[in-house]
């Protein structure tokens, strides 16, 4: 059996890894071993943070809605607001409610008054 020296294949594989790591800083973009390690770390982080992003945005929307609902009324909170929303069968998700609360507070007040009464 003939000996395979892997010249072309190895170069092509390393070039692919270098292109991925070209924006990394220092040895992380130049040395082959560290680029492969950093590539693995980057892929793991991106996979983890794709699911974390959904959590973070939901938390941000809830915080914004809670802040606006507590502004006017003394004993009114986010949990009561959402409970009344479901009770009245109004189909507005948290993202839309947060956008309304930020951009058009009058509209949000109309919605909350409609829910309470």
From Swiss-Prot:
One of its GO terms (biological process) is translation. Binds directly to 23S ribosomal RNA and is necessary for the in vitro assembly process of the 50S ribosomal subunit. It is not involved in the protein synthesizing functions of that subunit. The lineage of its organism: Eukaryota, Viridiplantae, Streptophyta, Embryophyta, Tracheophyta. One of its GO terms (cellular component) is ribonucleoprotein complex. GO terms for molecular function: rRNA binding; structural constituent of ribosome. Belongs to the bacterial ribosomal protein bL20 family. It holds the Pfam family Ribosomal_L20. HAMAP family: Ribosomal_bL20. This is Large ribosomal subunit protein bL20c. Keywords: Chloroplast, Plastid, Ribonucleoprotein, Ribosomal protein, RNA-binding, rRNA-binding. The gene is rpl20. Its main location: plastid. It is found in: Plastid, Chloroplast.
């Amino acid at each position: 059996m003939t000996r395979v020296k892997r010249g072309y294949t190895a170069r092509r594989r390393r070039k692919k890894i270098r292109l991925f790591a070209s924006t990394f800083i220092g040895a992380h973009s130049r040395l082959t071993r560290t680029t492969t390690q950093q590539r693995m770390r980057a892929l793991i982080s991106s996979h983890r943070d794709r699911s974390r992003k959904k959590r973070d945005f939901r938390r941000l929307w809830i915080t914004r809605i809670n802040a606006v609902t507590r502004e006017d009324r003394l004993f009114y909170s986010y949990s009561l607001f959402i409970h009344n929303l479901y009770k009245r069968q109004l189909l507005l998700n948290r993202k839309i409610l947060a956008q309304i609360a930020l951009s058009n507070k009058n509209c949000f007040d109309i919605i909350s008054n409609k829910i309470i009464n």
